[in-house]
């Protein structure tokens, strides 16, 4: 069963990208294939986390060997710090390449020639792969450690990783993922007060008060050149970008008492763990096997919009891929299963679509994680193909006109929800003509 992908509505980070890729020789089964010439590619490409092939599954991009560590690496110690892993469904793999481009603070392509932000080759090959073993669903697992010495970023800032086959054309794209290179020069301090400046939001929202200490690089143009980005958990849909300070002091910038730093409190994420197909963990109604695949039925869910807040441990919407069998290798012996989710709801929404949000679908909103209303059952259904592991997820709505995502109708909003906020401070370098990432931190709301 294949899933058709479609991005959600308008993409604010849609951009035109012109890539020039210099081909280098490669060897396959002792056959030398000559170096291809310089070829220019010209097509539209969003600088966002997106999948372009149905076969792409379980993409992980993380730092320092930790699946849940964001792909942010230091400029002065980059080699091999990032790990990329993913699966392609089926019994035959593809010869895949990767490259990256430098982006602005708000995820548009930088106006830089490649030799200004990268040293070495223009692309690399992903040649570490293995075939699934003893699984009902066949797949090919790929892994890559990068950056490598023969293709290394030169500047700090935002980067888009691009994985593709053959020549870099729109038809050959497999997926794209964001990562960052940090040249830390400032300190970011965050507090989350109990009450918002707008007291009417204090029970449902969280407001961040932020200061950026930068005594060594303070310039008279910092209000123009400095930009702050704030993300809630792993989300990009509600990220605040290009934030300017409310007040400028001699040695720090203040982003306190700013309505743009107010976020919906949301709720704790729901959890599902099917790392073991022979044990029904919390909230799993049943697990069964067909001739072709495993099926995991999650317990019937009820909206939490009007229910009291309950605190329990989650991993803030992330996922952790593993198989609970010491004798199995997760990379190639973990199987896939269809996860069935059902949210009881009295009637279909008229102006919103309902989605399953989280790293369970790489924080994307597309046909894959959009729920469909079943009149006979009286609720929304969704079926997701997932690799064995532990997942967090949340039911959310997306307005069909604005694409804005909210939790008030499905999960509810609470001031005391445990959220993780990620903050990035960029400074535009007029000499290098690019946005440099010079500050990064994470903070928990409670």
Protein language model features and the residues they cover:
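Short acidic/polar inter-strand loop motif in beta-rich domains
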Residues: 105-107, 151, 165-174, 276-283, ...
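Contiguous beta-strand segments within globular domains
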Residues: 51-102, 200-214, 328-341
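Basic K/R-rich, polyanion-interacting modules in nucleoproteins and related proteins
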Residues: 298-350, 438-444
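Aromatic-rich carbohydrate-binding modules that target alpha-glucans
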Residues: 119-143, 236-245, 340-388, 400-430
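Short, compositionally biased P/S/T/A/G/V-rich stretches that sit at domain boundaries
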Residues: 41-76, 183-199, 315-328
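Ligand-binding face of N-terminal immunoglobulin V-set domains in extracellular IgSF glycoproteins
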Residues: 138-151, 156-166
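Low-complexity, Pro/Ser/Thr- and charge-rich linker/hinge segments at domain boundaries
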Residues: 44-49, 181-205, 415-438
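Bacterial Sec-dependent N-terminal signal peptides
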Residues: 1-44
């Amino acid at each position: 069963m294949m899933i058709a992908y479609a991005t959600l509505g308008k993409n604010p980070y849609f951009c035109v990208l012109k890539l020039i890729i210099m081909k280098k020789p490669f060897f396959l089964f002792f056959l030398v294939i000559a170096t291809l010439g310089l070829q220019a590619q010209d097509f539209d490409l969003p600088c966002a986390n997106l999948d372009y092939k149905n076969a792409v599954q379980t993409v992980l991009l993380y730092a320092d060997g930790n699946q849940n560590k964001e792909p942010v690496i230091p400029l002065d110690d980059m080699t091999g710090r990032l790990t990329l892993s993913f699966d392609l469904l089926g019994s035959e793999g593809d010869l895949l390449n990767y490259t990256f481009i430098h982006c602005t603070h708000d995820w548009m392509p930088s106006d830089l020639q490649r030799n200004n932000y990268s040293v070495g080759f223009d692309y690399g090959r992903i040649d570490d792969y293995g075939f699934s073993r003893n699984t009902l669903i066949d797949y090919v697992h790929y892994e890559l450690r990068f950056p490598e010495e023969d293709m290394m970023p030169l500047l700090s800032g935002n980067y888009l990783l691009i994985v593709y086959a053959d020549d870099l054309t729109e038809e050959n794209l497999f997926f794209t993922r964001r990562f960052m290179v940090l040249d830390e020069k400032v300190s970011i301090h965050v507090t989350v007060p109990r009450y918002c400046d707008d007291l009417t939001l204090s029970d449902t929202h969280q407001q961040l008060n932020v200061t950026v200490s930068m005594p060594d690089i303070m310039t008279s143009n910092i209000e123009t050149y400095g930009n702050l980005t704030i993300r809630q958990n792993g989300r990009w849909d509600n990220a605040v970008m290009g934030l300017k300070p409310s007040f400028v002091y001699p040695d720090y910038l203040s982003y306190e008492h700013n309505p743009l730093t107010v976020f919906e409190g949301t709720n704790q994420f729901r959890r599902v763990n099917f790392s073991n197909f022979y044990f029904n963990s919390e909230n799993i109604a049943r697990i069964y096997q067909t001739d072709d695949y495993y099926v995991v039925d999650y317990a019937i869910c009820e909206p939490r919009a009007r229910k009291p807040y309950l605190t329990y441990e989650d991993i803030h919407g992330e996922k952790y891929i593993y198989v609970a069998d010491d004798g199995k290798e997760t990379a190639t012996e973990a199987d896939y299963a269809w996860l069935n989710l059902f949210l009881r709801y009295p009637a279909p929404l008229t102006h919103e679509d309902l989605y399953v949000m989280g790293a369970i679908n790489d924080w994307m909103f597309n046909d894959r994680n959009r729920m469909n209303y079943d009149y006979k059952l009286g609720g929304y259904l969704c079926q997701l193909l997932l690799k064995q592991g532990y997942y967090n997820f949340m039911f959310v709505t997306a307005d069909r006109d604005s694409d804005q995502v909210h939790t008030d109708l499905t999960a509810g909003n609470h001031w005391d929800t445990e959220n993780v906020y990620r903050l990035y401070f960029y400074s535009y370098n007029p000499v290098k003509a690019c946005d440099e990432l010079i500050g990064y931190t994470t903070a928990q709301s409670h």
